């Protein structure tokens, strides 16, 4: 909407014309003391600019044609002087029962109801409006420059040459702008003002203003409405005020002693009351001075100064809603963020925070958006943590942090230079290992972080080749891992990657490679001579190049893809193991043949369903070479599953390349509906080994995990299943069956129901027999994974719903994360109450769990933000698959 000039202040409007209408009223047929009380005056300018006015009986009908009014009445048409101004009646068509354009859901059309969240009982819907000609008013019709028309059924009286009074209702139209009143209108030419009384209504697209009276001061370009109310349809807000002043030079409402709310009219859950309020509808920003927040008409918060707030999604400087919580670990936790909208492309947030059992903390975040990058800098400082205990600070598992002063620094950067260059930086540092567990998220989300990523990347990608470089350091912040632990990962200082692809007819050529410098700083004091002799301190460079050629042949009935490749690796080592080479290298050939067929059949009673049968064979041969004396910088055993049947290596990284002479047998069947949707899938497969596997990792435990199946001639039987029971129900499952031991090695199952965003039910179970542990298993602790996870959201009605999660470790009889809560929500506010029990350190080798409990409350006022406990939303979205805020229509 464009309020370049108010209707009431426009120089071409009837009321504010520079004397033209007043002169015509004084010198034409209207000079008689009053017009007939039984008629209706309707005027419109003709092609020459003269006004054609007629007195119409109220029972008569009139038609507008080509700039003149044709009256089906017995009276003559009087002509006003050229240059005078007039208006026509603007008919309004709205929904039955609508009050100030608020339409209850029951009275909406199906199309309107589809755009309203389920928890809302109605919405502000702007009615369609028609002019005198019966045509719907064009919302884009600019009032400035549009002809001004008016109509009145009342009497027009002239007191003096400068003053005119109109008794009765007056309706004015100028473009898409209309104004009406019911009682009387006084025009003062000398003062250039107009006074209207009796049910004044002012409309433009997206704006409705009503009041008991209005005063227009053209000299100051202001329109004043008394005892007023307003509706801004675009933002879904409304309110009332003793006075509203509309400034014609901009889309601004100045409100005195007014209210602001997004709730249902007459049933406001919350309102903002203010001495003075300014709503800039063009910018989407409001400001209020002397603000009182009222909940159900009870004042709960007062701010005596000026506070900005958004009308929509705009960013505005000012205090954000506070966050309030309480946990057994930190006590009462209160944070009050202050947002600084410094410029359109950068901003900052400063958050003072008080933790009852720890002390005062301050955090800051600065965000900068450049033409080619997004950048964020975050910092936090808690000086003098009151839970610090010097006597126990160095004891693993102690409640005391390792340091008295706690801090955090983080930098994130993501850039895109043109279409081919990209950059990324991620840097984090903390004062101690328990920082995130104690302070990371106010107790509302699990923060058991054990690693900090520090990396920077620069990449270039062309259509047929790529190159990149990165540096990476992973810091361990696990209090149970020492600085001499051999499982501390290596740093990449730096790493270069490259690759290219090319097509020659049907042949596909590809090469990938990398060069990495691996470095690691271990505490020598914690290492034994045997460990150092075995290469615990080894570091160095590694070059890996992998050319490959393939000839894919694909068709509707199947495919066959033969591939041949060579993998060459060279190391340059320092402090390598005793008796090993300083510059070893390795070159291994590879051949694979991947093939599959697709059979289809129509199901006799399948209502258009098609069933497929898809056998697949994957043969892999990889040369064997003794690699036991090579370092393991980044290699690890990949967990075996159905997808692993078709991989060319059972290890990740390039320090180990698995030897193989094997054939993978797989069979899948799919059920596809007539619309092409996959409704079910079942796959099963196994690897047949023609030779024993020799290559293993160095870790004794990982060697045991690897060697366990290496002498068998068959792998475990693996399968996966998917079944779409209906549009709402979905079942997924996978299984790994050990034929030799006749037991399940690993399995998982999940069943999910989602009718919509407000009807969610998830249940899952995960089992794994062998877990990779880097230390002895304590007596009485079951290292197997046996976990169930149940979560859901279920509404009791359109406003109330239950939500919760139960994540349980059956191996050791403990809750990993359990919460239950209730929520009330409408289109005005959301209230949540959640009780939670969780553990931060859920590593399986811990004898004692660090259990936390808490009760959290959240009140969200739509349009104002979270009044308390804002982190609950993240906790729910992390814990309940598919969770969304109540009422979202996405």
What residues fall within each predicted segment?
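General helical structural elements
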Residues: 8, 15, 65, 76-79, ...
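Gram-negative bacterial Sec-dependent N-terminal signal peptides
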Residues: 2-30
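Residues at the start of alpha-helices and the adjacent loop-to-helix junctions
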Residues: 9-10, 23, 177, 554, ...
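Short helix-loop boundary/capping segments at the starts of domains
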Residues: 21, 172-175, 516, 520
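Conserved beta-strand and immediately adjacent loop positions that scaffold enzyme active sites
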Residues: 169, 275-276
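Short, intrinsically disordered low-complexity segments
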Residues: 3, 10, 60, 71-74, ...
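Outer-membrane beta-barrel proteins and related beta-barrel translocases across Gram-negative bacteria
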Residues: 97-101, 105-111, 116-130, 155, ...
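Post-signal-peptide, soluble extracytosolic/periplasmic N-terminal scaffold domains
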Residues: 33-248, 336, 340, 379, ...
């Amino acid at each position: 909407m464009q309020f370049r000039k108010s209707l009431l202040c426009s120089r071409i409007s009837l009321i504010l014309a520079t004397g033209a209408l007043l002169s015509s009223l004084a010198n034409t047929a209207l000079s008689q003391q009053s017009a007939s009380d039984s008629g209706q005056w309707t005027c419109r300018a003709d092609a020459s600019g003269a006004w054609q006015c007629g007195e119409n009986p109220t029972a008569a009908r009139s038609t507008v044609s080509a700039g003149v009014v044709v009256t089906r009445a017995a009276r003559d048409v009087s002509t006003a002087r050229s240059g005078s101004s007039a208006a026509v009646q603007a008919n309004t068509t709205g929904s039955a029962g609508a009050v100030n354009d608020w339409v209850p859901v029951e009275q909406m059309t199906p199309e309107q109801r589809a755009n309203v969240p389920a928890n809302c009982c109605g919405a502000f819907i702007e009615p369609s409006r028609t002019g005198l000609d019966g045509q719907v008013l064009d919302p884009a019709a600019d009032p400035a420059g549009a002809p001004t028309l008016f109509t009145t059924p009342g009497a027009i009286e002239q007191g003096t040459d400068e003053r005119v009074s109109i008794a009765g209702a007056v309706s004015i139209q100028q473009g898409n702008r209309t104004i009406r009143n019911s009682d009387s209108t006084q025009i003062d030419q000398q003062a250039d003002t107009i006074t209207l009384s009796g049910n004044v209504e002012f409309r433009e697209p997206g704006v409705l203003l009503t009041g008991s009276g209005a005063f227009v001061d053209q000299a100051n370009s202001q329109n004043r409405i008394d005892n007023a109310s307003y509706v801004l349809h675009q933002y879904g807000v409304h309110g009332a005020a003793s006075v509203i002043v509309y400034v014609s030079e901009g889309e601004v409402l100045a409100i005195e002693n007014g209210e602001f709310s997004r709730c249902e009219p007459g049933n406001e859950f919350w309102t903002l009351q203010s001495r003075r309020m300014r709503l800039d509808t063009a910018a989407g920003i409001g400001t209020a001075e002397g603000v009182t927040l009222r909940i159900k008409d009870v004042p709960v918060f007062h701010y005596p100064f000026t506070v900005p707030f958004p009308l929509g999604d705009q960013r505005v400087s000012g205090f954000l809603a506070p966050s309030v919580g309480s946990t057994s670990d930190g006590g009462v936790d209160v944070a009050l963020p202050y947002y600084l909208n410094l410029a359109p492309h950068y901003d900052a947030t400063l958050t003072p925070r008080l933790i009852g059992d720890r002390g005062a903390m301050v955090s800051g975040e600065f965000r900068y958006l450049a033409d080619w990058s997004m950048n964020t800098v975050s910092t936090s400082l808690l000086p003098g943590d009151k839970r610090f205990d010097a006597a126990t600070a160095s004891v693993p598992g102690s409640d005391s942090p390792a340091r008295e002063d706690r801090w955090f620094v983080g930098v994130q950067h993501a850039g895109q230079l043109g279409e081919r260059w990209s950059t990324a930086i991620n840097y984090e540092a903390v004062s101690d290992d328990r920082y995130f567990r104690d302070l990371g998220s106010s107790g509302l989300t699990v923060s058991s972080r054990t690693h900090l990523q520090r990396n920077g990347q620069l990449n270039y990608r062309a259509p047929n080749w790529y190159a990149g470089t990165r540096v990476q350091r992973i810091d361990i912040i696990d209090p149970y891992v020492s600085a001499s632990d051999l499982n501390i990962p290596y740093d990449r200082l730096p790493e270069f990657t490259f690759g290219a692809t090319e097509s020659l007819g049907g042949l596909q050529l590809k090469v990938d490679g990398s060069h990495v410098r691996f470095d690691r700083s271990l505490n020598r004091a914690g290492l034994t001579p045997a460990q150092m002799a075995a290469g615990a301190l080894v570091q160095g460079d590694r070059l890996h190049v992998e050319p490959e050629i393939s000839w894919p042949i694909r068709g509707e009935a199947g495919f066959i893809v033969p591939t041949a490749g060579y993998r060459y690796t060279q190391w340059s080592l320092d402090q390598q193991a005793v008796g090993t080479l300083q510059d070893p290298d390795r070159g291994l050939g590879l051949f694979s043949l991947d093939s599959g067929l697709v059979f289809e059949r129509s199901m006799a009673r399948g209502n258009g369903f098609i069933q497929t049968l898809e056998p697949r064979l994957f043969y892999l041969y990889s040369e064997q070479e003794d690699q036991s004396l090579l370092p393991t910088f980044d290699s690890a055993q990949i967990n075996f599953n159905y997808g692993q049947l078709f991989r060319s290596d059972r290890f990740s990284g390039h320090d180990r390349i698995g030897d193989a002479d094997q054939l993978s047998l797989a069979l899948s069947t799919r059920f596809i509906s007539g619309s092409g949707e996959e409704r079910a899938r079942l796959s099963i497969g196994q690897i047949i080994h023609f030779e024993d596997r020799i290559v293993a990792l160095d870790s004794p435990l990982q060697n045991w995990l690897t060697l366990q199946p290496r002498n068998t001639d068959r792998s475990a039987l693996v399968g996966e299943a998917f079944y779409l029971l209906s549009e709402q129900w979905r079942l997924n499952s996978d299984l790994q069956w050990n034929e030799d031991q006749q037991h399940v090695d690993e399995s998982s199952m999940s069943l999910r129901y989602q009718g919509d965003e407000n009807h969610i039910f998830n249940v899952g179970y995960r089992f794994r027999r062998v877990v990779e542990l880097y230390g002895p298993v304590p007596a009485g602790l079951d290292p197997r994974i046996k976990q169930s996870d149940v979560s859901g959201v279920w509404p009791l009605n359109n406003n109330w719903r239950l939500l919760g999660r139960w994540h349980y470790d059956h191996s050791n009889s403990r809750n990993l994360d359990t919460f239950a809560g209730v929520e009330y929500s409408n289109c005005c506010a959301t209230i949540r109450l959640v009780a939670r029990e969780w553990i931060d350190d859920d590593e399986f080798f811990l004898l004692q769990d660090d259990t936390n409990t808490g009760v959290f409350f959240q009140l969200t006022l739509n349009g104002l933000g979270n009044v308390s406990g804002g982190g609950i939303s993240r906790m729910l979205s992390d814990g309940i698959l598919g969770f969304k805020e109540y009422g979202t229509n996405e």
